[in-house]
Amino acid sequence: MVINTNMAAMTGAHGLDDSQRNLTKSLARLSTGSRIVDPQDDAAGLAVSSRFTAQISRNSAAMNNLANAVSYSQTQDGFMQKMSTALDRMGELTVLAQDITKTDTDRSNYSVEFSQLQNYISDIGTKSFNSVPLFSSAGNEVTIDSDANTFTMNAVDINSTTAATGLARAFDATTSAIYTTTSASSALSNIQTAIQNLADMRANIGANIQRLNV
């Protein structure tokens, strides 16, 4: 038996195979935009690349968390601007109700609007952002980076009945009413305190936004 061997043809075929593999790899690199297509391209480089890719994904998620937290805080402040306007009008009504030339009927008319504004503020206190309460006694915790470090936002509790911190005494009809000059005077005191408390809360929200944007 005679076995014919064409070395030139075999060498050419081998070279063609190498060229085809290199072309396939080059096309894969072009299509993926990655220098490392297979582990054998650069085993150590692949390990480093995988770590970076995972960290980038976590960073992206953390940035998304921060953006949502800022939107949450801005929504809080938007509602609190409306509360500020309502409290200003309530304060005006309490002063009008203390006018000695006003009759009980006049005060009753003022009370209708006053009560509506109380209900308006009370309703705002129940608002939520994607089902997360906007106003509560506990600050929300936000993951702010890829290493899972967190930042606890300042709590904003408008429903607190504590006179020095909340607004409830201003929008609760049992503690603030303007049917008489005496009750109107007491209501005005509650509203003045609530206006200051609201300003403090908005300052806390501003601090939250500032920290989240750092």
Which residue stretches match the model-derived regions?
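Alpha-helical transmembrane segments of multi-pass integral membrane proteins
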Residues: 14, 213-214
